[in-house]
């Protein structure tokens, strides 16, 4: 069981930023390229990017600086920035007009809000929506006057599909415990899942010799 947990943890880290693993020999990972392209489409907007680990922050910071050398980049992690500095950051970010806030999701305290940010990118998922909402709700406030766009960037057909399904299933259970009997299809619509997520999930299977292997969705590998 411990070996399986270690494999899952490694797969999730590789999904977030494979170039943080010493054995990686490829170019810029596809997910980081996707996020860079999204930033290019939002070149005139302030954008926030929230990941879970500092090493992933560093990977994205390097790629962003290389792609957008003239665009303001603000990097925030829990151990590198004081609360006073984060409050000062709010003013500086707003004045930048098209700055990029790159941070760990847990580094933004509830006392500092960024209601002027309309686009939030989350390329690394938590295990439940309540943890992620603590981050993106820093940008969705009662005094917000514009529509907010929250983007969950994941690899389709990878372990991240399983993680997303778990997040959605937990959200359904959470709503049920609060007296809201919501259909899972409604949860899909709320989160913008417009594809057949169940068909791309990974599952653990056994072959005819009793050996465990991973099956990717409904694909049949021959």
Give short role names for the model-derived ranges:
Residues 1-45, 64, 171-190:
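Interdomain linker/hinge connecting the two RecA-like lobes of the SF2 helicase core
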Residues 48-50, 58-59, 68-108:
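Conserved helicase ATPase core of P-loop NTP-dependent helicases/translocases
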Residues 74, 121, 151-153:
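Hydrophobic/aromatic beta-strand patches that form the interior of the parallel beta-sheet core
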Residues 16-20, 53-57, 80-81, 107-109, ...:
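Short, solvent-exposed loop/turn segments at secondary-structure junctions
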Residues 57-61, 86-87, 99-147:
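SF2 helicase motor core recognition
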Residues 10-11, 35, 49, 102, ...:
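Generic structural signal for small/hydrophobic residues in well-ordered secondary structure
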Residues 2, 25-33, 51, 80-87, ...:
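Conserved phosphate-coordination/catalytic loops
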Residues 127-136, 140-221:
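A conserved SF2-helicase RecA2
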């Amino acid at each position: 069981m411990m070996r399986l947990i270690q494999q899952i943890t490694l797969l999730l880290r590789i999904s977030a930023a494979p170039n943080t693993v010493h054995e990686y020999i490829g170019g810029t990972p596809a997910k980081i390229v996707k996020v860079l392209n999204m930033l290019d489409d939002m070149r005139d907007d302030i954008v926030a990017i929230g990941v879970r680990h500092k090493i992933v922050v560093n990977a994205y910071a390097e790629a962003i600086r290389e792609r957008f050398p003239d665009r303001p980049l603000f990097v925030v992690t829990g151990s590198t920035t004081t609360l006073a500095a984060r409050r000062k950051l709010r003013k500086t970010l707003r004045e930048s007009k098209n700055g990029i806030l790159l941070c760990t999701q847990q580094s933004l305290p509830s006392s500092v809000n960024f209601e002027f940010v309309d686009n939030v990118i989350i390329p690394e998922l938590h295990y439940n929506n309540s943890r992620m909402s603590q981050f993106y709700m820093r940008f969705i406030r009662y005094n917000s006057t514009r529509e907010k766009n929250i983007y969950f960037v994941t690899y389709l057909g990878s372990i991240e599909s399983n993680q997303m399904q778990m997040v959605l299933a937990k959200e359904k259970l959470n709503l049920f415990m609060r007296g809201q009997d919501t259909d899972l299809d409604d949860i899909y619509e709320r989160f913008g899942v417009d594809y057949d997520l169940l068909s791309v999930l990974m599952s653990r299977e056994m072959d005819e010799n009793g050996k465990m292997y991973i099956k990717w969705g409904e694909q049949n590998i021959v």
